[in-house]
Design a protein with these regions (language model features):
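Glycine-rich loop(s) and the adjacent beta-strand/alpha-helix scaffold that form part
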Residues: 123-185, 325, 331-334
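Conserved N-terminal/central alpha/beta ligand/cofactor-binding core
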Residues: 22-109, 207-222, 247
Length: 341
């Protein structure tokens, strides 16, 4: 999202733009997402949900997102729904493939399968490589020693290229570099890409969460359950058990009832054990996007001549969770505008 939005905005402002895409297609992890671009309905709720984030950055995203979403629709991005399904948030669900195509039409065709290397002297550079969740080494360094056991719930190319380049150019790390957004997934041999959303085990608030040694998760459980999945990621094998009482099986989640989610886990081979008046499901931490990254100002600046947006930029969702697509959209546009001065 961030790179394509920056390119489209820069072209709109009359700039010549080159886009270097490491992967074999455009769209990054946006194409694998549900396509919902949202913000918290109320500013105070945003601060409650992400209390450790940079307040100035958060204010920019919160105040500019609605106009940025209108800009996307003006480019022809197809809207699927104008509701998020969450009373705490407002936003729009786009068709991810159609959104990608609209941004490409407005911007430029990326040079696929190409890594940038070193920046070009005197040419503004916007880093939008999607974070570092695809690098086992960087995840091990900053997030968890259990990096090899995590399931990558994202594209395989976002492996810290932007982070490393920005640091080498004089940038610094944001707060929250140890945090990430992800989901608990069925602990099975493989979770297919088309199961990243539908197989999510999002019912920790109805369960007792314990690791293999019987140690319980005792922390808070927010609506997105990111605190839980981060805890799971630091347990042996990045695994845990959700133990659900029978009384909670009919509870509704955003992906279906708890019983339906458990059945999906069973069907893909996860261990599901029936116990006395409860069901236990083995889950593994899936990492979608790192929360921390390069420290930026409200225009996305990292260092002289270098900007960052999306997963490469940290500081917006620190301490919780907010729409990564929203941050990428707003800050990608802002970075392009500032880079063109």
């Amino acid at each position: 999202m961030a790179g394509l939005a920056a390119a489209a905005r820069a072209r709109e402002l009359g700039a010549r733009v080159d886009v270097y895409e490491k992967g074999d297609r455009s769209g990054g992890s946006m194409l694998l997402s549900s396509g919902v671009v949202w913000r918290y309905r109320e500013w105070d709720e945003f601060r409650r949900q992400c209390p450790d984030g940079d307040e100035a950055l958060q204010r920019v995203v919160h105040e500019e997102l609605d106009d940025a979403v209108e800009w996307l629709t003006s480019l022809g991005a197809p809207v699927v729904e104008v509701e998020t399904g969450n009373p705490l948030t407002v936003g729009v669900r786009f068709d991810p493939a159609g959104l990608c195509e609209a941004l490409l039409r407005a911007g430029v065709e990326p040079r696929l399968g190409t890594q940038l290397g070193q920046p070009f002297d005197g040419v503004p550079l916007i880093l939008a490589t999607g974070g570092f969740q695809g690098s086992r080494d960087l995840v091990r360094t900053y997030v968890t020693p259990e990096a090899d056991s995590l399931v990558l719930r994202a594209n395989p190319w976002s492996s810290g290229d932007g982070l490393l380049l920005g640091l080498a150019a004089g940038g610094s790390l944001s707060d929250g570099v140890e945090q990430f957004y992800g989901r608990a997934l069925p602990a099975t041999t493989e979770v297919p890409v088309d199961g990243f959303i539908g197989l999510a085990q999002l019912y920790a608030r109805f369960a007792e969460v314990i690791n293999e040694a019987g140690e319980r998760y005792e922390g808070p459980v927010g609506w997105a359950e990111v605190e839980v999945v981060q805890w799971i990621a630091r347990q042996p094998g990045a695994r845990a058990w959700f133990v659900v009482p029978d009384s909670a099986l009919a509870e509704e989640t955003r992906y279906g009832t708890v019983a339906e989610l458990i059945e999906r886990a069973r069907r893909v081979g996860a261990r599901v054990e029936r116990r006395d008046k409860e069901t236990a499901v083995e889950v593994v931490a899936g990492i979608t996007q790192t929360t921390g990254g390069l420290r930026i100002d409200t225009h996305g600046r990292v260092a002289d001549g270098i900007w960052a947006a999306g997963g490469d930029a940290g500081g917006v969702a620190t301490g919780g969770y907010m729409s990564n697509l929203a941050s990428a959209l707003v800050m990608g546009r802002r970075a392009a505008e500032d880079a063109l001065g």
